[in-house]
Amino acid sequence: MENKKVIVGISGGVDSSVSALLLKQQGYDVTGVFMKNWEEDDTDEFCSAEQDIADAQAVCDSIGIPFKKINFAAEYWDNVFEHFLIKYKAGRTPNPDILCNKEIKFKAFLSYVHLLGGDYIATGHYAQTRLAADGSVQLVKGLDDNKDQTYFLYTLGQEQLRQTIFPIGNIEKSKVREIAKENNLVTFDKKDSTGICFIGERKFKEFLSKYLPAQKGEIHDENGIKIGMHDGLMYYTIGQRQGLGIGGVKDRPEVPWFAAKKDLENNVLIAVQGHDHPLLFKQSLQAIELSWVAGMAPADKFRCAAKVRYRQKDQSCEVEVNQDGSVNVTFDQPQRAITPGQSVVFYIDDVCLGGGVII
């Protein structure tokens, strides 16, 4: 470890704070860097970037490591946000956190780490790396199953993983808070952020409407009968119940309505009644833009487990790789609310193989 230089991304949260502390305790030469990836365009209550910077600075001062700030707002806009808007406009529901890890934290930030003369990059993700028998680096689930974040990291390749340390990957979240408290870090009881990567806790619909004009349209039931109006297809995600604005439809039972499908051609949202309506379930999917941690798929056809959303339990499936690199995934059990634009991520036991974007 002696003199190995690690640059840790400090977000102002408890996970990255403890990551920096542990690295320092392990004898690394540690520098904390706060990435500013979004230019605030308002002063509303949800813009907490200033507080995050102050907390990040306080943590670094407390640990006794240098603190730096870097602005990646232009890179974030070009490589994450614009892509995000294009997908939303097309009626997809993209996952910006995955793209942010790929384009910002493990690309733009990694380049900056090299400029600083860093040997390693470190983040507060709940994930682990492991050396496989063939010398490749595996991306492994975090010890805390409830917090495992490999779903968001599946685009990382060998070169990135060889230069990455996840200091809290083998620790439970409760223990992380305990360590922060014992060491008097100001972030010990700070709540976890749930907003979109770097856009914070703002009201999403309001936020999106600033950038994309919404096209209102009709909501139909599965038989094509109009039952309401929607505010714009981009605001809805498959399986969504809240915010459909359908209530008390004449001659229909008082059962909740769910968004089941988007008819993009006709700008119609199709809704069905009941959480377990058959139209909400599918047994297969196709995915594109595949990324394999090892550099290639394990085989042309293989069995594994998959998640179609963060925190979903692993689902057994068969994966078939097509000539064009896309995959067909067939699940043993039908899956609820498979959402185009979201990612499907593959696992064998606790090893993340990679993933792709659902179409």
UniProtKB/Swiss-Prot annotation:
Recorded superkingdom: Bacteria
Binding site for ATP: 9-16, 35, 124
Top class in the EC scheme: transferase
Gene3D superfamilies noted in UniProt: Adenine nucleotide alpha hydrolases-like domains, HUPs, Translation factors
Region (Interaction with tRNA): 147-149, 309-310
InterPro entries per the UniProt record, alphabetical: MnmA-like, MnmA-like_C, MnmA-like_central, MnmA-like_central_sf, Rossmann-like_a/b/a_fold
Main function: Catalyzes the 2-thiolation of uridine at the wobble position (U34) of tRNA, leading to the formation of s(2)U34.
Classification via PANTHER family: MITOCHONDRIAL TRNA-SPECIFIC 2-THIOURIDYLASE 1, TRNA 5-METHYLAMINOMETHYL-2-THIOURIDYLATE -METHYLTRANSFERASE
Protein name, as recorded: tRNA-specific 2-thiouridylase MnmA
Protein species of origin: Francisella tularensis subsp. tularensis (strain WY96-3418)
Gene name as annotated: mnmA
